[in-house]
Regions:
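Short, well-structured N-terminal submotif of metal-dependent ribonuclease cores
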Residues: 1-41, 56-63
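Acidic, PIN/NYN-like endoribonuclease modules and their adjacent C-terminal/linker elements
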Residues: 105-132
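Alpha-helix capping/helix-boundary segments
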Residues: 9, 45, 85, 103-104, ...
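A general alpha-helix detector
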Residues: 9-10, 48-52, 70, 88
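Active-site-proximal, substrate-binding regions of enzyme catalytic domains
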Residues: 50-76
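Residues that scaffold the ATP/ADP-binding catalytic core of kinase and kinase-like folds
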Residues: 12-14, 52, 125
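Acidic catalytic patch
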Residues: 40-44, 66-94
Length: 132
């Protein structure tokens, strides 16, 4: 069976906090892997986790991205191609537009849409139109 992970589960697995709930989340994940289950993480959950790790856990962009990158290579875990493209951008922790913006543009592009934005930095990305 395939399960879509909520942000609350991803954060428990990435941070280990709070310990009791993180232990239960890890046990459920490990039991699922042993049973042959797969787990997917949506772009929205990846974005929420990225911001939450920084805001609530005091980690840097680079640390948040490293945690997500490491998690994405775990057994039975799948992220979207948009996530993979964004997270593997060289120096993504310093990039502008950043990780979430790149995931967004890639997601729209995947369905043939052009991203319409008022952010001038979006001109740096293919598949965008900037209103200015």
């Amino acid at each position: 069976m395939t399960f879509g992970l909520d942000t609350s589960v991803v954060l428990r697995l990435l941070t280990g906090q709070p310990q009791d709930l993180a232990a239960k989340a890890l046990e459920r994940y490990q039991d699922g892997i042993a049973a042959g289950d797969d787990f997917s993480v949506s772009d929205l959950v990846a974005a929420e986790s990225y911001y939450a790790i920084q805001h609530h856990y005091g980690k840097s962009k680079e640390e948040a991205l490293d945690a997500l990158r490491s998690f994405s290579s775990g057994d039975g875990i799948s992220f979207s191609q948009n996530f993979e493209a964004a997270i593997n951008t060289p120096n993504i922790h310093k990039a502008s537009p950043g990780f979430v913006d790149r995931m967004l543009v890639s997601g729209y592009g995947e369905t043939g849409q052009i991203t319409l934005s008022c952010e001038k930095l979006f001109r740096r990305l293919l598949g965008t139109e900037v209103i200015s």
